[in-house]
A protein has these predicted regions:
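Short beta-strand segments enriched in hydrophobic/aromatic residues
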Residues: 44, 56, 110-112, 144-147
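Short, surface-exposed coil-to-beta transition loops
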Residues: 89-92, 107-109, 122-128
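A solvent-exposed, acidic/Ser-Thr-rich amphipathic alpha-helical stretch
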Residues: 49-100, 119-121
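Beta-strand elements of well-folded, non-transmembrane domains
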Residues: 112-116, 131
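Short beta-strand edge/turn micro-motifs at domain boundaries
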Residues: 21, 124-154
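Sec-dependent N-terminal signal peptides
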Residues: 5-14
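A short hydrophobic beta-strand element
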Residues: 101-112
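Short, low-complexity N-terminal intrinsically disordered segments enriched in polar/charged residues
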Residues: 16-58, 102, 152-154
């Protein structure tokens, strides 16, 4: 009977979910998530495909301009916009970041401008991202971007 009890306790210990102390979430993680999101936008701003791929997961997905896009599709959209003369200025505001061991979520306002010079107009986006931690660090797995229409003038 004693052996059965020991075996039962051993199985229960192995099958129990890991405690939060095994995988802490810290202010440093919040800062790393913030940097990972900003690194993705920095790569897009200068059409740096290598840096973009380092900043996102292989299965990255974006909801942008009312469409679902892969990482390659989003990169090409921005790169082609730049090649056509369009300027896109992003200014990512403070982020709200939440997370746990291997996943994180971030949300922010992005206030900037876009257009073909000299017709550059103010733009505002509300954005959020889901990130995954890997051995290489935090990577953006999903981006959702919604353009906010300018307020009508009275």
């Amino acid at each position: 009977m004693r052996l059965k009890m020991i075996m039962l306790l051993a199985v229960a210990a192995i099958a129990s979910p890991a405690q939060s102390r095994d995988c802490p979430w810290s202010n440093a993680d919040m800062a790393r998530v913030d940097r990972a999101v900003r690194a993705m936008f920095d790569a897009l701003k200068v059409d740096d495909r290598t840096a973009f791929r380092r900043a996102v997961t292989a299965d990255f997905l974006a909801f942008e301009l009312g469409r679902r896009m892969s990482g390659d599709e989003l990169f090409k959209l921005v790169e082609d916009s730049h090649k056509s003369g369009r300027v896109i200025n992003w200014s990512i505001g403070p982020m709200i970041v939440r997370g746990d061991c291997n996943s994180a979520w971030a949300a922010w306002d992005n206030v900037g401008s876009a257009g073909v010079p000299p017709n550059i107009a103010p733009r505002r986006w509300m954005e959020s991202a889901a990130l995954r931690r890997s051995s290489a660090g935090w990577r953006v797995e999903f981006l959702h971007s919604t353009v906010i229409a300018p307020s009508p003038t009275k």
